[in-house]
Amino acid sequence: MNISNIKIMLLGSGELGKEFIIAAQRLGIHTIVVDRYKNAPAMQVAHESYVIDMLNSDALEQLILAKNPTYIVPEIEAINTDSLVKLEAHNFNIIPCAKAAKLTMDRQGIRALAAQQLNLQTSKFAFANSEQEYLDVIQSIGLPFVIKPVMSSSGKGQSIVKEHNEIKKAWDYAQNGSRGHAKGVIVEQFIDFDYEITLLTVRHKDGTSFCDPIGHIQKDGDYRFSWQPHTMPDTALAKSQEIAKEITDALGGYGVFGVELFIKGDEVFFNEVSPRPHDTGMVTLISQNINEFELHLRAIVGLPIPDIQTLQPSASAAILLEGDTANASICGIDKALADANVDIRIFGKKEIHGKRRMGVVLAKAQNTHIALETSKQALAHIHLTK
């Protein structure tokens, strides 16, 4: 295989994309990245970068036709997936495939596949496209419930509603967090689960491989901490792998899929799936012999996927900072790195207006509890320059 002739175009240039591009660069692959704003994280390490509205079909198709990449790799949901379907029909290689990109761009498509076609166990749910429909479905779902925009990312617009006086506020919050013109929401029965995991699932030319389960803590619908491995009963792990394989086989294509699952005893509930590396999987930058970004790249281009190993218990902590500046300066990294078991990735985002994830702390230890505490201690040192 001559990988030096491969040309990868990444649609979206965030922090996950940056690590993916670094993995490609290390193997001598030509990289092109695209996003809606200049100097996005992945643009800082790619050979070429372009700024376009990826929801604009003409702009997206013109750029792809002009650059003629070997592989087109979506990193975000805010892409015109109808264009991807069209381009795939003209023999462009969409990762993992246009069907997966289109189905997972909104929660309605993927939930219909999981619950209705595959009969996977999920929470009780309903969709609503207006405030009145929302009020109606609440009657059947009951309190407490979770509301999420049909189209959103990074937890935007998600909330848990426990009291009647929170119902209106949650609807408004979902509308403000919705992406594009979509106003629909999914209302889900709240499952009092024991824990939630991400099961990184790798579809490749030789079959399907799994990483050890990743435990994580979410706040306001967004990842804050993750750790690997998450200890769980063999029965629940086997069921989790079965569900992950079933949903990823239905989506098809090659690459890493982040399968989110709720676990209650030996019961496993499907939550969501993303056809790309997962933010909770950033812990694999320190925990595994091959991290999730390298796995994604290998699966895409057809390189071998050997035995995936967790080298040591590890944890990650999102560096979520708050401020209002166009030139963010981060302090405390020296103190955080004083611990030999800590590493840090700063994403290279300059602007921050409100709260923004600016980096990640990585820590390793003899067990995940200590690794998590170590990551939190290092995180406490990091702040914006005043």
Swiss-Prot record:
ATP binds at residues 107, 148, 153-158, 188-191, 196. GO terms for cellular component: cytosol. Its EC number is 6.3.1.21. It catalyses: N(1)-(5-phospho-beta-D-ribosyl)glycinamide + formate + ATP = N(2)-formyl-N(1)-(5-phospho-beta-D-ribosyl)glycinamide + ADP + phosphate + H(+). Homodimer. GO terms for molecular function: ATP binding; magnesium ion binding; phosphoribosylglycinamide formyltransferase 2 activity; phosphoribosylglycinamide formyltransferase activity. Residues 112-301 form the ATP-grasp domain. One of its GO terms (biological process) is 'de novo' IMP biosynthetic process. Belongs to the PurK/PurT family. HAMAP family: PurT. N(1)-(5-phospho-beta-D-ribosyl)glycinamide binds at residues 15-16, 75, 279, 349, 356-357. Pfam families: ATP-grasp (PF02222), PurT_C (PF21244), RS_preATP-grasp-like (PF22660). It comes from Francisella tularensis subsp. tularensis (strain SCHU S4 / Schu 4). Involved in the de novo purine biosynthesis. Catalyzes the transfer of formate to 5-phospho-ribosyl-glycinamide (GAR), producing 5-phospho-ribosyl-N-formylglycinamide (FGAR). Formate is provided by PurU via hydrolysis of 10-formyl-tetrahydrofolate. The gene is purT. Mg(2+) binds at residues 260, 272. Pathway: Purine metabolism; IMP biosynthesis via de novo pathway; N(2)-formyl-N(1)-(5-phospho-D-ribosyl)glycinamide from N(1)-(5-phospho-D-ribosyl)glycinamide (formate route): step 1/1. Keywords: ATP-binding, Ligase, Magnesium, Metal-binding, Nucleotide-binding, Purine biosynthesis. This is Formate-dependent phosphoribosylglycinamide formyltransferase.
